[in-house]
Curated annotation (Swiss-Prot):
This is Biuret amidohydrolase. Changing residue 175 to A/S: Loss of activity. Changing residue 142 to A/H: Loss of activity. It is an enzyme of class 3 (hydrolase). It holds the Pfam family Isochorismatase. Changing residue 41 to A: 540-fold decrease in catalytic efficiency. Optimum pH is 8.5.
Amino acid sequence: MDAMVETNRHFIDADPYPWPYNGALRPDNTALIIIDMQTDFCGKGGYVDHMGYDLSLVQAPIEPIKRVLAAMRAKGYHIIHTREGHRPDLADLPANKRWRSQRIGAGIGDPGPCGRILTRGEPGWDIIPELYPIEGETIIDKPGKGSFCATDLELVLNQKRIENIILTGITTDVCVSTTMREANDRGYECLLLEDCCGATDYGNHLAAIKMVKMQGGVFGSVSNSAALVEALP
C-alpha cells in the first residue's frame, strides 16, 4: 500500500477510504491507542489462558504493534495505553460481570497463576514487557470494555487536541470494537490496524473488522501496520 499526498495532506491507504478522511494526519493531532496488551489477556497464566483459549490468536498482534509503536514514537506521535482491571476491593466490579467470569472458571478477583485475576496492582493486570509504556506515555486504567467508560480518556484527548485515533490491541471484537465505537460517536476519526489486533475467536476478529467497513466506514477505516509505517508523515 502506498502513501498519497496532496498539498500537505497525508493519507494512509485504508479500506473503505483513505485515512484520515481530510488528510489532516500529523504527530500533534494523532494518537496511537494500544488497548489491553496485558498478561491477563495475552500471557501465560493470565485470564484468557485460564479460560482455555488459544493464546497464539491474542499474541499475534504483538510484533506488528511493536513496529508501529517504534515508528510512531520516533516521529513524536501521542501514545496511549489502556489496562482493564478492577479495584482490589472490587467495588467497581458489577455483580453480573463477576458472576459470568466465575461461571467460566476464571473469576475476576480470584487467585490465579499471575495473581488475582484482572485486579489492579497484580502481575497479570500489567502491560506485557514487549509493549511497556515509556516515560511520558499516558496509561488509562479502565474497569470495563470501552476505554471511555469511567475513565479520563476523553479529557486527555481534548487536552492534547487529538483529532485522529489509531486503534490496536485486544480483543478486536470486545474492547477494541467498543472503544472505536465510543470514539466515533465522539467525533474522533478512527483507524483500526487489523494485524495489530486479535481476538480469542478468529471469526469474531474478522466480523469486527467487517463491521467497521460497512456503510462506507460507519466507525472509521481499516488498514495494517505496513501501510501505516510506510506512509506515516
